[in-house]
Amino acid sequence: MTARLVLASNNAKKAVEMTTLLAPLGIEVLPQSAFDIPEADEPHPTFVENALAKARHAAALSGLPAVADDSGLCVAALGGAPGVQSARFAGEPKSDARNNALLVERLAGSADRRAFFYSVVALVRHADDPRPLIADGEWHGTILYAPRGANGFGYDPLFFLPELGQTAAELDAQLKNTLSHRGAAMRHLLARLSTAPL
């Protein structure tokens, strides 16, 4: 029997990533848009609080278990910014192009280009689940001076992986899922799900 799980996101590319990662467990991922669920507020100062709030919101409005992630780019020279504000770094409406341009602008003249992506994934079996499953992952790299690559989304075109000589936006989806912060968080979550199923 296939388990159904609501993804608390309207990001189509994130939905594809999550579906690919959860399919081996026989879990059908449904986007929250299938239930006309609006995006949850993300007012919290930490990734874990935002991920949990989004998962609880989707579970409450769908009546199904829900999974959410909150991810962001943390740049050393910017004191960890954009961090939890990564999607809205350049303000509303959200725009990957404007966020990337602002990041390049803020790092102009900085020799320290170190950065990492961080992801927290939260899964709740119901809206009031007292024992949510929470997992996280990191992905380290550096920030380029100009974007490269057409795959991925967000800051992927600027996020350079020195050991591969490529940006995240130059990787194919399978390799990205193997290496990425979200992939690492999902692998940790999958390990937990194997002992504490839906």
From Swiss-Prot:
The active site is at 70 (proton acceptor). Binds 1 Mg(2+) ion per subunit. Pyrophosphatase that catalyzes the hydrolysis of nucleoside triphosphates to their monophosphate derivatives, with a high preference for the non-canonical purine nucleotides XTP (xanthosine triphosphate), dITP (deoxyinosine triphosphate) and ITP. Seems to function as a house-cleaning enzyme that removes non-canonical purine nucleotides from the nucleotide pool, thus preventing their incorporation into DNA/RNA and avoiding chromosomal lesions. HAMAP family: Non_canon_purine_NTPase. GO terms for biological process: nucleotide metabolic process; purine nucleoside triphosphate catabolic process. Its cofactor is Mg(2+). Homodimer. Mg(2+) binds at residues 41, 70. This is dITP/XTP pyrophosphatase. Keywords: Hydrolase, Magnesium, Metal-binding, Nucleotide metabolism, Nucleotide-binding. One of its GO terms (molecular function) is metal ion binding. It comes from Aromatoleum aromaticum (strain DSM 19018 / LMG 30748 / EbN1) (Azoarcus sp. (strain EbN1)). Substrate binds at residues 9-14, 71, 153-156, 176, 181-182. It catalyses: XTP + H2O = XMP + diphosphate + H(+); dITP + H2O = dIMP + diphosphate + H(+); ITP + H2O = IMP + diphosphate + H(+). GO terms for cellular component: cytosol. Its EC number is 3.6.1.66. InterPro entries: dITP/XTP_pyrophosphatase (IPR020922), ITPase-like_fam (IPR029001), RdgB/HAM1 (IPR002637). Belongs to the HAM1 NTPase family.
